[in-house]
Regions:
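Alpha-helical scaffolds flanking conserved acidic
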Residues: 158-165, 182, 230-235
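Cell-wall polysaccharide-cleaving catalytic domain and substrate-binding groove, primarily
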Residues: 168-184, 213-220, 239-242
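An acidic, Gly/Ser/Thr/Pro-rich helix-cap/linker signature
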Residues: 1-153
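Short, surface-exposed glycine/acidic/tryptophan-bearing loops
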Residues: 119, 175-196
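Active-site-adjacent bridging/hinge elements
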Residues: 159-161, 188-194, 249
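Extracytoplasmic and endomembrane cell-envelope/extracellular-matrix remodeling and assembly machinery
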Residues: 103-137, 142-144, 154-155, 194-226, ...
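Solvent-exposed coil/turn segments that connect beta secondary-structure elements
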Residues: 169-170, 190-192, 283
Length: 295
């Protein structure tokens, strides 16, 4: 089976192991019925998994109901952390939630302290599983993947980059985001036009997988030239070249350092995790039969 060590010279995974493991689980173990409550910075800390039998759907009222339940659960976790911070670790007085939090923290080899609980209570984040979505992405990618890999090859770029749409769009050819990005590569209009894709009333080449792949290859080539390594170039696909160049000026070219130190209103969970999601997506898509058999 494929392991990330096979591509490590271009796409280093050292130091990212825990993050990759988290996303591997989100892609393969947890489906749309599952929502993980976890720490947004330390992805080893998964406090709870809430199951919704209706999954993501149907209708807005179901979505609202789920968010209400998750909001309450987040408050319960935060309150449990406050209690641990104030009352200490007397196991006789602990409820199930407090015991669970303590177990999770200790299994990550962290030292429980009032300061730690104070920090963690503000970091509780939700992440829904996307197993079904990822499986569909594997099936859809089969149509064009060989040609997409050839495109990257032609540009002298690593073929693994052709797997980035697993993270961007699950290879949904008609994908449109609320922000106005479209196609498997989720190009915004302005970027698409800058890379010579035609976007007007009669044609939108962002929805043409092969034309968009060629534009994405040129974008990533530019990013790599400007930023100097693949972790930064790939992160810039989510965060923008300018933002990552600024982060590099401040903190150097190691993505791990940037993730822990760079402060910016727009450099949040999605940007911090984009590169590791790519690593997990490469690993899962190359090993998908191990997880699910033939699709």
């Amino acid at each position: 089976s494929f392991s990330l060590n096979q591509i490590s010279d271009r796409f280093p995974s050292e130091g990212f192991e825990a993050r990759v493991a988290f996303w591997r689980a989100v892609f393969t173990q947890y489906g749309k019925q599952d929502v993980l409550l976890h720490d947004k910075n330390d992805l080893r800390l998964i406090y709870d998994v809430v199951r919704f039998t209706r999954g993501t759907g149907p209708g807005k009222s179901e979505t609202r109901r789920q968010w209400r339940i998750l909001r309450i659960r987040k408050k319960q976790l935060a309150a449990a952390m406050d209690s641990l911070r104030i009352r200490g670790l007397d196991s006789k007085k602990m409820d199930k939630t407090q015991q669970r939090i303590l177990t999770v923290i200790q299994s990550a080899e962290l030292e429980p302290s009032p300061l730690l609980f104070k920090k963690l209570r503000n970091n509780i984040h939700t992440q829904r599983g996307i197993k079904e979505k990822f499986q569909k992405g594997i099936i859809r990618s089969g149509i064009y993947l060989r040609e997409m890999e050839n495109t990257f090859d032609r540009h002298g770029l690593p073929k693994e980059l052709a797997l980035l749409p697993h993270v961007e769009s699950s290879f949904n050819f008609a994908s449109r985001s609320r922000r106005g990005a479209a196609g498997i590569w989720q190009f915004m209009r302005r970027t698409a036009r800058a890379y010579n894709l035609r976007v007007n009333r009669s044609i939108d080449q962002r929805l043409d997988p092969l034309a968009a792949t060629d534009a994405a290859a040129r974008y990533l080539k530019d990013s790599y030239r400007k930023l100097g390594n693949w972790p930064l170039a790939i992160t810039s696909y989510n965060h923008g070249q300018t933002g990552i160049a600024r982060a590099k000026r401040r903190h150097g070219s190691n993505l791990l350092t940037i993730i822990s130190k760079y402060q910016s209103r727009s450099f949040k969970y999605a940007s911090k995790n984009f590169y590791v999601e790519f690593l997990a997506a490469v690993e899962v898509s190359k090993n998908y039969r191990t997880y699910w058999g033939p699709l």
